[in-house]
Amino acid sequence: MAKDDVIEVEGKVVDTLPNAMFKVELENGATILAHVSGKIRMHYIRILPGDRVTVELSPYDLTKGRITYRFIK
């Protein structure tokens, strides 16, 4: 899958799950399961419930995603 094939959407972190997984509610109302990207993990950026984030979704599975950016409050 090429990097051009990803779908980027904004959402809000609803819940924190084990293994750096998060439940994210997207702008369209759907709730997905998302994990943290390597760059966010590498720079020790903390993601907490209530944070606004950008999520990359694969066109093949729209229920799982990768958190790529956390907006500053």
From Swiss-Prot:
Q: Which GO terms describe its molecular function?
A: ribosome binding; rRNA binding; translation initiation factor activity
Q: Where is the S1-like domain?
A: 1-72
Query: Subunit structure, per the record?
Result: Component of the 30S ribosomal translation pre-initiation complex which assembles on the 30S ribosome in the order IF-2 and IF-3, IF-1 and N-formylmethionyl-tRNA(fMet); mRNA recruitment can occur at any time during PIC assembly.
What's in the GO CC field?
A: cytosol
Protein name stated in the entry = Translation initiation factor IF-1
List the source organism. Lactobacillus delbrueckii subsp. bulgaricus (strain ATCC 11842 / DSM 20081 / BCRC 10696 / JCM 1002 / NBRC 13953 / NCIMB 11778 / NCTC 12712 / WDCM 00102 / Lb 14)
Q: What is its main location?
A: cytoplasm
Q: Which keywords does UniProt give here?
A: Cytoplasm, Initiation factor, Protein biosynthesis, RNA-binding, rRNA-binding
The record's annotation in SUPFAM superfamilies points to: Nucleic acid-binding proteins
Write out the similarity annotation.
Answer: Belongs to the IF-1 family.
Organism placement in taxonomy: Bacteria, Bacillati, Bacillota, Bacilli, Lactobacillales
* Function per UniProt: One of the essential components for the initiation of protein synthesis. Stabilizes the binding of IF-2 and IF-3 on the 30S subunit to which N-formylmethionyl-tRNA(fMet) subsequently binds. Helps modulate mRNA selection, yielding the 30S pre-initiation complex (PIC). Upon addition of the 50S ribosomal subunit IF-1, IF-2 and IF-3 are released leaving the mature 70S translation initiation complex.
Q: Does the keyword NAD apply?
A: no
Q: Where in the cell is it found?
A: Cytoplasm
